Regions:
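Interfacial juxtamembrane loops and adjacent helix segments
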Residues: 55, 63-115, 272-279, 343
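Membrane-interface alpha helices of multi-pass inner-membrane proteins
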Residues: 58, 153-158, 186, 196-211, ...
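Transmembrane-helix motifs of polytopic, lipid-linked glycan transferases
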Residues: 120-145, 178, 182
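Perimembrane helix-loop-helix junctions
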Residues: 185-189, 216-249, 308-321, 365
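Short acidic/glycine- and proline-prone juxtamembrane loop motifs at membrane-interface regions
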Residues: 168-175, 298, 352-353
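Membrane-lumen/periplasm interface segments of specific transmembrane helices
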Residues: 208, 227, 240-312, 328-341, ...
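Start-transfer (signal-anchor) and selected internal transmembrane alpha helices
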Residues: 1-41, 46, 141, 239-247, ...
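Membrane-interface transmembrane helices that cradle and orient dolichyl/undecaprenyl
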Residues: 15, 144, 173, 183-197, ...
Length: 482
């Protein structure tokens, strides 16, 4: 007998005409700033950080039909997108002609690159960001948020998070964010459709091609989805199992074959074998403080919309949605734990929260749940202000010499631009990991401020209409709060 999925862990995502109209409006609201950001970035800035090195892989594929990138660096064949000198990012010997970076991202956007060069890649990234926003909307709508708060949450993620920052850049973290959000959405659906299983299988199979760092995101989603299929139909439904395991298996076998043939190894991280700071070299508690409160690379000063995550989690768990959050913890927990033990948790030369951009959007339900339970004009206004802060910081980055990129500066780059415009000090009042890590007081005071904000949201929350299930029967929606 086929058992139904647990209601507290599944979602009803039956679309309605009103939902489709709301989604269209959401994509328009988010798409215009994203497109403007991408085009401004394209025509006013060279690619920074790892961006040009991903594009070098595309150029090697285009010119030579191979991924031996050394010849692109040696011949300066990258000048179409990076007119200045470019230090090679190549693997350690004996593979010094091969790329340091994963080839999955360049393979995914190679057709846009062939059609439009760097412009095509940035437009591809805008499409990825909009798909992430759309999946966030369907995720939180299916989990019971009303249409208004699902729309607000979508705007918060689309314009108030790392989604906006990285939409105009050729980094691979947005690809992982889309896969994680979509995978979690499929996991929480009331009904697993064959096409969803095919798509999520292909997406999860592509993750380690994009970067081996994303393997800790792939494994939990694969196991949780497999467990759900087994719980609902055992081993009898061969069509479901084939849909789920087929693309995943093909891409996994292809990856193993690629590693063995090209790299003479079965290690998915062989291209970064020279990296000595991957794991277990940092205190995770201290790293967590930096991730949250460091003004330069942390999350909360650049993306204050995530202040709503903790009160949202508390309210949702208290409202009976424990299974959902246990699943969320299982999906993102291993990845976060690994990053917190790495001295490189801050992500190197990049905009803020680069490595965390892969998982931040999946916390959308907690944000939306907090807003819906609060139903307070001031709380909603604060959420809108958080989005405007992120958009303002993103705009100020365009006026900085580094375009918002930093590494060990000890200050938030766009705020330094604002200081120059207003002749006022802002960065001196904020905690800075790389220059003032030994001075704990700024971290303490701002940490207390974060807790106080969470308490305000919790105290403003109205009682849930009925605690318990997030989703309902496939034919109706269950609202999570009055």
């Amino acid at each position: 007998m086929v058992s139904a999925p647990s209601a507290s862990a599944t979602a009803d995502t039956t679309p309605t005409p009103g939902d489709r109209s709301a989604l269209t409006a959401l994509l328009a609201v988010c798409g215009v700033p994203m497109m403007v950001s991408a085009l401004v970035h394209r025509y006013t800035r060279m690619p920074e950080g790892d961006e040009p090195h991903y594009l070098v892989i595309n150029e090697a594929l285009k010119r030579y039909g191979s991924i031996h990138v050394r010849q692109v660096y040696d011949s300066w064949a990258f000048t179409a997108f990076h007119p200045g000198p470019l230090s090679p990012h190549v693997a350690a010997p004996p593979h010094e002609t091969l790329p340091w970076h994963g080839i999955g991202g360049p393979l995914l956007w190679h057709v846009p690159y062939l059609l439009g060069g760097r412009t095509g890649v940035l437009l591809f990234m805008v499409a990825v960001s909009l798909l992430t926003v759309a999946n966030v909307f369907w995720l939180v709508r299916g989990l019971g948020l009303d249409r208004r708060h699902a729309l607000l949450t979508g705007v918060g993620i689309g314009l108030g998070s790392t989604v906006l920052t990285y939409t105009a850049k050729a980094f691979v973290e947005p690809l992982a964010a889309l896969v994680v959000v979509y995978g979690f959405r499929v996991l929480t659906k009331a009904r697993l459709r064959t096409r969803d299983l095919l798509l999520v299988s292909a997406a999860l199979g592509a993750l380690p091609w994009v970067h081996s760092r994303f393997l800790p995101l792939e494994f939990p989603l694969v196991l949780l989805l497999a467990w759900r299929i087994h719980r609902e139909s055992g081993l009898r439904d061969r069509r479901r199992w084939l849909a789920f395991l087929g693309p995943l298996g093909v891409l996994t076998v292809a990856l193993v074959t690629y590693l063995r043939t090209v790299w003479q190894s079965f290690n998915p991280s062989v291209n970064q074998a020279g990296d000595k700071e991957l794991l277990f070299g940092a205190n995770p508690v201290k790293s967590l403080v930096g991730v949250l409160l460091d003004q330069e690379h942390g999350v909360l000063f650049s993306y204050p919309i995530f202040l709503f995550v903790l009160p949202g989690v508390i309210l949702a768990v208290a409202g009976g949605h424990r299974t959902l959050h246990l699943q969320l913890l299982a999906v993102v927990g291993p990845y976060c734990a690994i990053l917190l033990t790495s001295p490189g948790w801050w992500g190197g030369w990049a905009p803020p929260a680069r490595l965390w951009a892969a998982v931040l959007p999946v916390f959308a339900f907690s944000i939306g749940y907090a807003l819906q339970r609060a139903r307070n004009g001031l709380v909603t206004a604060w959420a809108a202000a958080c989005v405007l802060v992120t958009m303002g910081l993103d705009t100020l980055c365009r006026f900085s010499p580094s375009n918002g990129f930093s590494a060990d500066y000890g200050y938030l780059v766009p705020l330094r631009v604002l200081e120059g415009l207003t002749h006022r000090s802002f960065t001196g009042y904020l905690p800075a990991w790389h220059t003032r890590a030994e001075a704990p007081w700024p971290f303490l005071w701002w940490g207390l401020a974060v807790i106080a904000f969470g308490l305000v949201v919790l105290l403003s929350a109205r009682p849930a209409a009925r605690p318990g299930p997030v989703g309902g029967a496939p034919s109706s929606r269950t609202r999570v709060a009055a």
